[in-house]
């Protein structure tokens, strides 16, 4: 029996960038011919959502806006052109809500780089609401019976770090440094790296985060609040420097340090997006060491399916804390203060 779809729902909305977050009644969207209507049960909270709210990236958001792009829920409606889905399927709302599927980037599986990409919680109302729409081609298929609260962070954080590790192209047994390892992306990056056979040196601040990342499989921990020379500490922990570095923190300094501590032929992958930041790399050292500096955006449909498969096989545990949708302003506050361990997940029924 299909679900009765209401006319209005609860959502967290802001009318201006930097404006007040309001938990209020909001219209339930009608899916376009190519879209699913998903009853969002849970949504992760990503640092990108904070940037969308502030409007501090060089890409304009829609306004008013419902943020969120880690929504896990159930298909309750669909447009007439949708194929491959049925009512009752578990579905995920990702950062990439839709793309043109005809440009050179879409044709080579690089849909996130599409010039017409529609972004959940940025240019398209996202998952901080009870009912949301998503392009049926890009929506993530979630296996039946999956714990929707726990899988929610995989839809962005998990896919993003998994793609970054693939971009680093490291071999099993090699070292990878993960900066910001105790946060939402970092805690998943540690686990995906271990599941891929890599040795992990985690970088973050404080004893609590050190214990946390080691419990997830990090072999070594460098504490930026205690180690005076981060570059040397990382090199020492990895016998000369890691073979790759995944920068998920929003620290420009951490990015610059990663260029210094990777060993010759090392690969520096940029994931976190600190506002207005630049990468500074000594050209002589970069050439002589033959290092690579790469950007890694979110994954495509194949990356998403693979990242969810790692989770479904029990190789990835999402360290989550569940709070109500109405608690989003407090979660943003904790995020700005750097006080989040793991990932916050919002229960849209509260």
UniProtKB/Swiss-Prot annotation:
SMART domains: PKS_ER. Its EC number is 1.1.1.1. NAD(+) binds at residues 180-186, 204, 209, 271-273, 343. It is found in: Cytoplasm. The keyword Cytoplasm applies. GO terms for molecular function: alcohol dehydrogenase (NAD+) activity; zinc ion binding. One of its GO terms (cellular component) is cytoplasm. Zn(2+) 1 binds at residues 46, 69, 156. It holds the Pfam family ADH_zinc_N. It is an enzyme of class 1 (oxidoreductase). It catalyses: a primary alcohol + NAD(+) = an aldehyde + NADH + H(+); a secondary alcohol + NAD(+) = a ketone + NADH + H(+). Its cofactor is Zn(2+). Disulfide bonds: none annotated. Binds 2 Zn(2+) ions per subunit. Zn(2+) 2 binds at residues 100, 103, 106, 114. Keywords: Allergen, Cytoplasm, Metal-binding, NAD, Oxidoreductase, Zinc. InterPro entries: ADH-like_C, ADH-like_N, ADH_Zn_CS, GroES-like_sf, NAD(P)-bd_dom_sf, PKS_ER. Belongs to the zinc-containing alcohol dehydrogenase family. Homotetramer. This is Alcohol dehydrogenase 1. It comes from Candida albicans (Yeast).
